[in-house]
UniProtKB/Swiss-Prot annotation:
Top-level division of the source organism's lineage: Bacteria
NCBIfam families per the UniProt record, alphabetical: tig
Protein name: Trigger factor
Family: Belongs to the FKBP-type PPIase family. Tig subfamily.
HAMAP family for the chain: Trigger_factor_Tig
Domain PPIase FKBP-type residue range list: 161-246
Cellular component, GO, one term: cytoplasm
Functional description taken from the UniProt entry: Involved in protein export. Acts as a chaperone by maintaining the newly synthesized protein in an open conformation. Functions as a peptidyl-prolyl cis-trans isomerase.
Annotated GO MF terms: peptidyl-prolyl cis-trans isomerase activity; protein folding chaperone; ribosome binding
Amino acid sequence: MQVSVENTSALERRMTIAVPAERVENEVNKRLQQTAKRAKIAGFRPGKVPMTVIRQRFEADARQEAFGDLVQASFYEAIVEQKLNPAGAPAVEPKSFEKGKDLEFVAIFEVFPEFTVAGLESIKVERLSAEVADSDLDNMLEVLRKQNTRFEAVERAAQNDDQVNIDFVGKVDGEAFAGGSAKGTLLVLGSGRMIPGFEEGLVGAKAGEERVVNVTFPEDYQNLDLAGKAAEFTITVNSVSAPVLPELNEEFFAQFGIKESTLEGFRAEVRKNMERELRQAIKTKVKNQVMDGLLAANPIEVPKALLENEVNRLRVQAVQQFGGNIKPEQLPVELFEEQAKRRVVLGLIVAEVVKQFELKPDDAKVREMIEEMASAYQEPEQVIAWYYKNDQQLNEVRSVVLEEQVVDTVLQKATVTDKSVSYEEAVKPAEAPAAAE
């Protein structure tokens, strides 16, 4: 077999393969012999059909089948021989497939980039440290109470944080518009759920009162037909209800699946959850900085095939998450390219770090991570057992642990500065990660 390889770009390869005619004919004959054993042709007993007849009837199909199998087999043999690592399936261009001649074809494909991870010493990481103070715990308890607010009808003017039941009709240029009218809508004033000016126009209103509120739709409003336009809403207030926060009692504690019947016990459970979230937030911020540093220090070219696959995967995820009747391929590629490229590049870099430093998932850390996740459930031992009985779930945890070991490896060489901050600052969502160049 003859093989020649041309580098048509940094990652694209054009491989020409010639399979000897003798091997081709052997493959064709092999298929014809198999066909002869089972062929049923009028006038002949099964298995006794002359080969000349078999050739007349089935050689074209046998040759086509042999072509497909030989292309696949010889391509694999060629990439092993040439020590190439394709990043996707090849595009095959037949050149010659005549009887009695060599089978010749061209395979065009991309290879994975070859590189060594560098610049670890140039990476700078700010590692936060924080504690859950009593004031943080008090604030969290208030958040939990507000999340479980109930409303009771009152006979007074509406104010911010009250819930109003309203009917409304909206008009633009004197004409009602689609989606601009509703009845029995519940709205918490000050929630920012409606466009600017709508909720403010209801402060001070009482049950049974009708108000006319003039607003302007934002320039970036999702409905382009309404964006930037002035509108008039006629609003009828059906009722006004004031918020009532629940008491911190056993009934309230039970809503969170916590068996503790005392405030002290509930506070201890909430603190435990906050500390777990704090550890995860700090870990995530460190990881993001490490990944950003790896990206900046290791600019690599991405195989188009990998990028296309990742974009398609993100499209499918988006459709599954947001639903609707749209098909994944209808979503614009541009929406996902940046995220897809970051994921692909980081995947290649992380894999190279694993290879370069000979990393393997630490079983003790895998167990520790599973126990940490299980601690958030009422029956942690059952959760732990479930993970170890499900290979797919266990492998996902092992992958996360391996990625954490990559982060730890980088931190050993990076410049790390520690900074003490408040709980709020530590758990505040990080800025969007940097894009791959």
